[in-house]
Amino acid sequence: MENTSITIEFSSKFWPYFTLIHMITTIISLLIIISIMTAILNKLCEYNVFHNKTFELPRARVNT
């Protein structure tokens, strides 16, 4: 019976720290993934030639 009480006490002390560390690591990993995705999308928009032309062509048609 002493072993079960020790494990329950250890798990009750350990569980909040585990969930807090898990939440912090997931938030940090999500921020890293989102920043990498935004950097990739910005580079794709810079190298895409048709990205700027789609905004310029309707203005040219309206002016003429």
From Swiss-Prot:
Protein name per its UniProtKB record: Small hydrophobic protein
Organism lineage reads as:
Viruses, Riboviria, Orthornavirae, Negarnaviricota, Haploviricotina
* PTM description: Four species of SH have been detected in infected cell cytoplasm: a 7.5 kDa non-glycosylated form (SH0), a 13-15 kDa form that contains one or two N-linked carbohydrate side chains of the high-mannose type (SHg), a 21-30 kDa polylactosaminoglycan-modified form of the protein (SHp), and the isoform generated by alternative translational initiation. Of these different forms, SH0 is by far the most abundant protein detected during virus infection. Tyrosine phosphorylated.
Notes on how activity is controlled:
Channel activity is inhibited by copper. Also inhibited by small-molecule pyronin B.
Query: What InterPro entries does the entry give?
Result: SHP
Q: Where is this region: Interaction with host BCAP31?
A: 6-15
Q: Can you tell me which family this protein belongs to?
A: Belongs to the orthopneumovirus small hydrophobic protein family.
Pfam families attached to this UniProt entry: SHP
Bilayer topology reads:
Single-pass type II membrane protein
Instruction: Provide this UniProt record's keywords sorted from A to Z.
Output: Activation of host caspases by virus, Glycoprotein, Host cell membrane, Host endoplasmic reticulum, Host Golgi apparatus, Host membrane, Host-virus interaction, Ion channel, Ion transport, Membrane, Modulation of host cell apoptosis by virus, Phosphoprotein, Signal-anchor, Transmembrane, Transmembrane helix, Transport, Viral ion channel, Virion
Which species expresses this protein natively?
Human respiratory syncytial virus
Q: Cellular component per GO?
A: host cell endoplasmic reticulum membrane; host cell Golgi membrane; host cell plasma membrane; membrane; virion membrane
Name the domain of life. Answer: Viruses
What interactions and quaternary structure are annotated?
Homopentamer forming a funnel-like pore. Interacts with glycoprotein G; this interaction occurs on the surface of virion particles and infected cells. Interacts with host BCAP31 (via C-terminus); this interaction is direct.
